[in-house]
């Protein structure tokens, strides 16, 4: 699935002025390209809420080009929690590392016995050709008993998709009921949302 977003080249406009005008400054880049751009903040919010880092966003440029991209980094204003800068990675024919959503299906046998399914990862880092990017990877958890876990090596990957993480990475597990409260406490103690959603190519701006 892909989404479309109008983008404009920056020709000397200051980022602060663009933000005051409701625009979001950014950069589009790959190994052969590095160009400053901006997009409408409201339109970006609409598209990014759906596409996130998992789906292709096609930038429609004033010169008629339509470039397929993935969002690699979004910097947020610390006080208002709104985007200040975005990095778009421009896709080519070369394989790319990206996060693909996981879709869990089935009810684990262990859940029927009173256990709780712990979804440790909601997406997985893979290496894939842009033409083979899947919308999601289905994960069948119906066979998991209490105490069982499912690892990256257990995933049934679509053709042309390779793991970019350790095969031993735990994806999901069914835990005993008595562990649920402990897991909730651990989740509450986790670090708050990072300012940078995904690390990409940084740009220094005044």
UniProtKB/Swiss-Prot annotation:
It comes from the Bacteria. It holds the Pfam family Ribosomal_L25p. The keyword Repressor does not apply. The keyword Transcription regulation does not apply. GO terms for molecular function: 5S rRNA binding; structural constituent of ribosome. Belongs to the bacterial ribosomal protein bL25 family. CTC subfamily. Part of the 50S ribosomal subunit; part of the 5S rRNA/L5/L18/L25 subcomplex. Contacts the 5S rRNA. Binds to the 5S rRNA independently of L5 and L18. This is one of the proteins that binds to the 5S RNA in the ribosome where it forms part of the central protuberance. GO terms for biological process: translation. Residues 184-206 are annotated as: Disordered. Keywords: Ribonucleoprotein, Ribosomal protein, RNA-binding, rRNA-binding. InterPro entries: Rbsml_bL25/Gln-tRNA_synth_N, Ribosomal_bL25/Gln-tRNA_synth, Ribosomal_bL25_b-dom, Ribosomal_bL25_C, Ribosomal_bL25_long, Ribosomal_L25_dom, Ribosomal_uL5_bac-type. GO terms for cellular component: cytosolic large ribosomal subunit. This is Large ribosomal subunit protein bL25. Residues 195-206 have a biased composition (Basic and acidic residues).
